[in-house]
Amino acid sequence: MMTDEQRQHAVAVIQQALPTLEWILQPAKIKRLSRDFHWFSPLLTEQLAGKQADAVVRPRDEQELRQLVAACAQHQLPLTLRGSATGNYGQLVPLEGGLLVDMTGLNQIVALGNGTVRAQAGILLADIETAARPTGWELRCMPSTYRLASLGGLYGGGFGGIGSINYGPLAAPGNVLSVKVMTVEPVPRVLTIPAPEALLLHHAYGTNGIILEVELALAPVHQWIERLDVFDDFADALNYANACVRSPGLVKRQVALLATPIADYFSHLKDRYRTGQHAVISLIAEESEGLCASLLQRHRGSNAIRQASDEARTQNASLMEYCWNHTTLHALKVDNTLTYLQTAFDPLRYPQQILQMEQHFAGEVISHIEFLRDSEGNLTASGLQLVRYTTPARLNAIMQIFRDNDVKINNPHVLQVEDGKQGVIRPDVVAVKQSLDPAGLLNPGKLRGWALRDQLELDSNPLALATRETPTT
């Protein structure tokens, strides 16, 4: 690891060599840009205190990025990629200083048509939707932060979100078609990597390659109706949500279940329903919505909010921004002692597990359930439960109780890629880093397998399907 003085000297030399790049050197701005939403976790807040870059650079195009990467490789200076900083695990927070590379200048759609889109990593997901919807297509899955989140950030640090009820997470087969990457070498190479190899760089926090472009398959566009329905009984709300999920003819984009008092944290909405009610937020295609009334009656619910999604989005009032980890954000604005979990239920018995865990914790853990298909296509549920936080020991005990009841934990309170995924070290992901970032300069400290690479059996050619772009002179 470089000393502070060595890093600062390298930054000064690179800045002097590349003065036309957009450099951000003011300490307050560097500190702000070195942050994401890891403050959702009291554990990460403590672990990442004081961690930041030495400087921030915002390349305007691929050529400027190439010059910057080459200089970092020559000087062995760490670099970490930044999208829009909507991640929750400190993905972009530099552990060893160096340069923070703001990718938002690379924000163009490269190709759009025939149900696919290829775009640069720094583009906002909302801008892809805006361009695609008039052509009859929309994103298959996107986070609730779609207005702010970048494509590269979703690819490097995200999972799925709105639309995953149909298409599964981003990593499900068929969603990602290819990625274009740049290596971190004194003479950087540019490669196009088709799926499935492309997924070796997905959710790796930008540790094993620089994502330049992502090619995605799109979904047919629908006119969506956003609904918030309320229930006095949690089991009724769960059964209504599950009935929506398991009705194949009900065209939907999103179904979320929120136990009380979560809906009470929605300060802009809560005058539309009674305090203490459970809620289900859904996006239902206009042509399918007629089914909701009978389902709602059967499960003793009532509708509190109904709005056209297109109109709501133009007013920045979409219910999509009350789902996924936006739910956590709204809750923390009201009660900053809360934190959250990430859980994955069993596709064969998720309704029973959800009810069991809601009853077991009796308000200490508050059910926030997102319904989706898993990567194998099974209808299932994931949780982003809110937790009334007391101590690290109790938080870990709560997570163990879920595990003991056959509910998987994807731990959002840890820094390293593998520790959020049940601790599994993947030699293929490490092999890609060795191929694309041989000096280990990308986001150092986040990929635990890199420190253990000498103990792993690594494929010397992990990207056999990749094609190299011929450099232009």
What function would you assign to each model-found segment?
Residues P261-Q307:
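A conserved active-site cap/scaffold subdomain adjacent to cofactor or substrate pockets
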Residues I14, C72, Y240-R246, S288-S302, ...:
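Short amphipathic alpha-helices in soluble, non-transmembrane regions
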Residues R60, D229-D233, I281-E287, Q342-L348, ...:
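Short beta-strand-to-loop capping motifs
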Residues M1-A70, T86-G115, I262-K270, T314-D335, ...:
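N-terminal flexible segment immediately upstream of the FAD-binding catalytic core
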Residues L77, S84, Q91-G98, T104, ...:
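Conserved glycine-rich FAD pyrophosphate-binding loop
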Residues N239-L269, A304-W324:
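Glycine-rich, acidic
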Residues V110, L125-A126, T130-G249, D459-A466, ...:
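FAD-binding subdomain of flavoenzyme oxidoreductases
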Residues W23-P27, R58-P59, L79-G83, V101-M103, ...:
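General beta-strand structural signal in soluble alpha/beta enzymes
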